[in-house]
Design a protein with these regions (language model features):
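Hydrophobic transmembrane alpha-helices and their helix-loop junctions in integral membrane proteins
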Residues: 106-155, 165-454, 458
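Transmembrane helix-loop-helix hairpins at membrane boundaries of multipass inner-membrane proteins
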Residues: 1-134, 209-219, 247, 278, ...
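Alpha-helical transmembrane segments
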Residues: 1-14, 60-70, 101, 134-141, ...
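Hydrophobic alpha-helical transmembrane segments
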Residues: 94-100, 225-237, 424-431, 501-521
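Hard-cation-handling environments
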Residues: 459-515
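Alpha-helical transmembrane segments and their membrane-interface junctions
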Residues: 148-159, 395-410, 471-494, 563-566, ...
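Aromatic-capped, Gly/Pro-kinked transmembrane alpha-helices
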Residues: 486-509, 526-602
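Membrane-helix interface motif
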Residues: 15-23, 71-81, 202-212, 397-411, ...
Length: 602
């Protein structure tokens, strides 16, 4: 009921305010003062887990520093800040509300059946499902607050809540690995929180305002705000798992599947790219924008390469998420109208398709006992409906004419128009590598094997509802691509940039939408009532007639086995991570040295 209420409320708010920009001024009100209390409560929660339960005192020090800084700023700036436009609801905000509300609610519905089976399977894990759902809904609530906040002080409050919620969800099983990875997520995001607090203090003391829209306006007016932008970007990098901060998102795989789906699709990482996209008009022609461009581009390329060598389904999805988030950040760093359009469209398509894929992998893991892609042989026989859901999700991520590929087409155009050949090379080669891991995955699940029994009986109605709804959403969002662009994204960009134009010709978008419709209709209609010609598969020996076995040299019957090549000697995870981390760290340090050293003025 709670999930349904959240989804319905999200739809109601979206349809009520779509096309309009609504601004609320809270001022120095009781609600504004309440944000300070929430900051303190969040800090107390961090202190409890870091000092009392697990004795990670240095992490508590990070929280103490930023809390002390924010409280000091609240005290010294009292009565001096301009509190205009504390809450802003525009089309981009509404898109994020729909992503968090609808997709988050579907993940909650899926979790009911999944977590029940999870607890039966893992009897050594303490049953804390009530706590799990409490944190899940708190997470969604914090996302709503974060995306409507234009006042950086309010956004900071919700930002910290999401950091603590992710920490609690990742550590749900309370195993040593889960606890270690949850603390990794916490300290990395607290590091970003410290950068957020520093940005608020610098802006508040310098310009007597903490409004995000005011910051963008100052940048467009040529005011020296590059330090503030760089600090907020660093904060966004940690939350959106850019290299070298991607370790926390990879570590989050130890959590139950609904947590992974939530972190990757509708909350946590989307909070990071939301902030960076909001800053998009202020970037592009300064060193903060340059930092975002290259950190995002490098992350996109190396994360995509690292995914090639992985056979763990969740890890492939994690690297794919990091890669696509890198592309979003890279587009935002360019700062142009076309790049902003591309970034928002990728956010939409990625959220729907990736949530579907995570839930599909989690379901397969529960039914098959493994999430290794090499164990997905014959999934088409054993779990045909789940296999179809996976195919739709994978197609949505990299095949034409689905939305992600069209968005990369737009990204290519934005990079060319902006005159960034290096970024174009990263995009081209990074996109090419996605074919390797998605095609391998498709080949495994569509293979037909002997001795496969149906295993879909254990999937609950709630899980099927979430999976099928997300499958249809992936298709419908691609079909409605032109409408989403015209009525969702372009009005926001018109207000933000002061003009509007088609990034990709509307006629081309309509053609792509019609192609998606035909992809749905033709397979269901083709060949009905017509005689079918069956041709045996070419195997490594004489086909026995069932396409699943062949006769070897000794006339013995050998079952067909398919194995993928993961190219670890070329695209090994450690090699790709170290290269990406080193380049991104160098980029961040160099740009901060230039900005803080005053060599140039951004």
């Amino acid at each position: 009921m709670s999930a349904a209420a959240i989804a319905m409320l999200s739809l109601f708010v979206a349809f009520t305010y779509f096309g309009n920009k609504v601004v609320f001024r809270l001022g120095d009100s009781f609600l504004a003062q309440g944000a300070i209390l929430v900051d303190i409560l969040v800090a107390l929660a961090v202190f409890y887990y870091t000092c009392v339960r697990f004795h990670r005192y240095w992490i508590a020090l990070l929280e103490a520093i930023q809390l002390g800084a924010v409280l000091w700023f609240e005290y010294v700036s009292h009565g001096t800040l301009d509190y205009y436009a504390d809450i802003v609801v525009d089309n981009f905000t509404l898109i994020m509300i729909l992503i968090a509300g609808v997709i988050g609610s579907l993940i909650a519905v899926f979790s009911l059946g999944y977590m029940e089976a999870f607890q039966k399977e893992h009897r050594d894990v303490r049953d804390r499902r009530n706590f799990f759902f409490f944190v899940l809904f708190l997470f969604l609530s914090a996302m709503f607050g974060l995306v409507v906040s234009n006042n950086l002080l309010y956004m900071y409050t919700f930002w910290e809540i999401t950091s603590v919620c992710s920490f609690l969800l990742i550590g749900y099983t309370e195993s040593r690995v889960a606890v270690n990875n949850s603390f990794k997520a916490l300290w990395m995001n607290l590091l970003g929180g410290a950068a957020f607090a520093a940005a608020i203090i610098v802006m508040g003391l310098t310009y007597h305002s903490t409004a995000l829209s005011h910051l963008v306006g100052l940048a467009l007016a040529g005011m020296p705000v590059t330090v503030i932008l760089a600090l907020l970007l660093l904060c966004g990098f940690t939350k959106s798992a850019m290299m070298p901060f991607s370790g926390w998102l990879l570590g989050a795989m130890v959590a139950p599947t609904p947590t992974s789906a939530l972190l990757h699709s509708s909350t946590m990482v989307k909070a990071g790219v939301f902030l960076i996209i909001k800053l998009c008009p202020a970037l592009g022609n300064n060193h903060a924008g340059t930092m975002a461009m290259f950190v995002g581009g490098i992350t996109f390329f190396f994360a995509s390469c690292a995914a090639i060598s992985q056979s763990d389904g969740k890890k492939v999805l994690a690297y794919s998420t990091i890669s696509n988030l890198g592309l979003i950040v890279c587009c935002a760093g360019i700062g142009s109208y076309e790049a902003a359009w591309t970034a928002i469209m990728i956010v939409i398509f990625h959220a729907v398709a990736k949530s579907l894929l995570f839930l599909s992998v989690g379901t397969a893991e529960q039914q098959l006992g493994s999430r290794d892609i090499e164990r997905f042989d014959g999934l088409f026989n054993a779990m045909p409906h789940l296999c179809l859901c996976m195919v739709i999700g994978i197609s949505g991520m990299f095949l034409a004419p689905f939305g992600m590929l069209i968005s990369k087409w737009a990204a290519m155009k934005a990079f060319i128009d902006a005159g960034h050949p290096m970024l174009l090379l990263l995009l081209v080669f990074g996109s090419a590598t996605t074919i390797f891991y998605w095609a391998k995955w498709l080949g495994k699940i569509l293979s037909v094997m002997n001795g496969q029994e149906r295993r879909e009986q254990g999937i609950t109605q709630g899980e099927w509802f979430a999976l099928k709804t997300l499958s249809w959403m992936t298709i419908i969002v691609c079909i409605l691509f032109p409408l989403i662009s015209s009525y969702g994204v372009l009005p926001y960009l018109r207000i933000t940039y002061g003009f509007t134009r088609d990034v990709i010709a509307q006629s081309n978008l309509i053609i792509m939408s019609l192609m998606v419709v035909l992809l749905v209709i033709l397979p269901s209609r083709y060949g009905k009532g017509q005689p079918k010609r069956k041709v045996g598969a070419l195997l490594a020996g004489v086909n026995t007639g069932d396409d699943r076995n062949y006769r070897g040299a000794g006339d013995n019957i050998i079952p067909v086995e398919l194995r993928n090549w993961y190219m670890e000697e070329w695209f090994g995870e450690k090699k790709m991570k170290l290269s990406g981390f080193a380049l991104c760290m160098a980029c961040i340090f160099i740009q901060f040295a230039i900005i803080l050293g005053g060599v140039y003025r951004g």
